[in-house]
């Protein structure tokens, strides 16, 4: 009998932990990219084309 209890299931727990952490960080980074960067670029582009349409409408 050893003084230490055998370590069982460590690999399975580690794999599950790594997968959960990976998906969580991936989701956070994707959300940051979408709401922090992408939406600002799209809003700027839409404002540009709306302004351009107003200028063309005023010319005619």
From Swiss-Prot:
Topological domain spans for side Mitochondrial intermembrane: 39-57
A single GO BP: mitochondrial electron transport, cytochrome c to oxygen
Subcellular location, record wording: Mitochondrion inner membrane
Positions of the propeptide removed during maturation: 58-60
Transmembrane region(s): 16-38
GO cellular component, one term: respiratory chain complex IV
Topology in the lipid bilayer: Single-pass membrane protein
Isomerase found in the keyword field: no
MF terms (GO), sorted A to Z: cytochrome-c oxidase activity
Leader sequence residues: none
Involved pathway(s): Energy metabolism; oxidative phosphorylation
Stretches in topological domain Mitochondrial matrix: 1-15
Entry keywords, A to Z: Cleavage on pair of basic residues, Membrane, Mitochondrion, Mitochondrion inner membrane, Oxidoreductase, Transmembrane, Transmembrane helix
Organism domain of life: Eukaryota
Quaternary structure and partners: Component of the cytochrome c oxidase (complex IV, CIV), a multisubunit enzyme composed of a catalytic core of 3 subunits and several supernumerary subunits. The complex exists as a monomer or a dimer and forms supercomplexes (SCs) in the inner mitochondrial membrane with ubiquinol-cytochrome c oxidoreductase (cytochrome b-c1 complex, complex III, CIII).
Record's function text: Component of the cytochrome c oxidase, the last enzyme in the mitochondrial electron transport chain which drives oxidative phosphorylation. The respiratory chain contains 3 multisubunit complexes succinate dehydrogenase (complex II, CII), ubiquinol-cytochrome c oxidoreductase (cytochrome b-c1 complex, complex III, CIII) and cytochrome c oxidase (complex IV, CIV), that cooperate to transfer electrons derived from NADH and succinate to molecular oxygen, creating an electrochemical gradient over the inner membrane that drives transmembrane transport and the ATP synthase.
Family affiliation: Belongs to the fungal cytochrome c oxidase subunit 7a family.
Name under which the protein is recorded: Cytochrome c oxidase subunit 9, mitochondrial
Organism: Candida glabrata (strain ATCC 2001 / BCRC 20586 / JCM 3761 / NBRC 0622 / NRRL Y-65 / CBS 138)
Taxonomic classification: Eukaryota, Fungi, Dikarya, Ascomycota, Saccharomycotina
Gene: COX9
């Amino acid at each position: 009998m050893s003084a230490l209890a055998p370590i069982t299931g460590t690999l399975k727990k580690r794999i599950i932990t790594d997968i959960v952490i990976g998906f969580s960080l991936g989701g956070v980074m994707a959300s940051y990219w979408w709401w922090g960067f992408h939406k600002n670029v799209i809003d700027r582009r839409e404002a540009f084309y709306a302004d351009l349409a107003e200028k063309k409408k005023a010319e005619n």
